[in-house]
Design a protein with these regions (language model features):
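Conserved helix-to-beta-strand junction in the class I
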Residues: 46-53
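C-terminal lobe and adjacent flexible extensions of AdoMet/dcAdoMet transferase-like proteins
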Residues: 135-169
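Conserved catalytic loop of SAM-dependent methyltransferase domains
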Residues: 104-140, 158
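A short, conserved alpha-helix within the catalytic core of class I
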Residues: 33-46
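Conserved SAM-binding strand-loop segment of SAM-dependent methyltransferases
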Residues: 1-15
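A conserved beta-strand element that flanks and buttresses the S-adenosyl-L-methionine
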Residues: 26
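Conserved class I S-adenosyl-L-methionine
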Residues: 56-81
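Short alpha-helix
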Residues: 85-109
Length: 169
């Protein structure tokens, strides 16, 4: 079992970076820091080169579409839009879903944080503004309730963070 952990610039990975193939490659909110869509695609392609024949790449990244859905609802209720950090380019689900990757295929997208974002960015934000006359507070009980609901997916379209699972072709 190869259980080495490496810290590299993912945009500079090429065919000579590794001498071996991997069962799993995991990215957690890293590819979203690549600020060009094509370079994000290239990064997924390049990482996919290093998966073994039955390998999986698990990417937990922010979703532009989930963020847009949250903001559409926030605007309806007079809440400010939430802008992504300047150092992130959230995944465009349409691009990721429809792109013809050469060596991996997207097998599943899991919107595991939908309920959390729905409650904290919409329900609680409205409650704080309309009834408490205060800004949302991460220590509020509704934040804790929302965290306990993560994974239930009552509200799939509001997941700002999703898991994208790719399998070696």
């Amino acid at each position: 079992i190869n259980d080495d952990f490496l810290k590299l610039d993912m945009t500079e990975i090429n065919s000579s970076t590794f001498n071996e193939k991997f069962d799993f490659i995991i990215s957690k909110r890293a590819i979203q820091n690549v600020l060009d869509t094509q370079l994000q695609i290239n990064t997924i392609e390049n990482l996919g080169n290093f998966l073994d024949d039955n390998g999986f790449m698990v990417c937990v990244e922010s979703s532009k579409n989930g963020q847009e859905n949250i903001n559409k609802e926030r605007i309806k209720f007079g809440l400010e839009e939430i802008m992504p950090p300047y150092h992130n380019l959230f995944f465009d689900d349409n691009v990721i879903t429809n792109y013809s990757f050469k060596n991996v295929r997207l097998v599943e997208t899991i919107p595991f944080a939908s309920d959390f974002y729905f409650i904290t960015r919409l329900v609680y934000s409205r409650y704080a503004k309309e009834y408490l006359n205060e800004k949302p507070n991460y220590d509020h009980p509704l934040e804790k309730i929302a965290l306990s609901m993560t994974g239930e997916s009552y509200t799939k379209r509001f997941s700002q963070i999703k898991t994208y699972i790719f399998k070696k072709k």
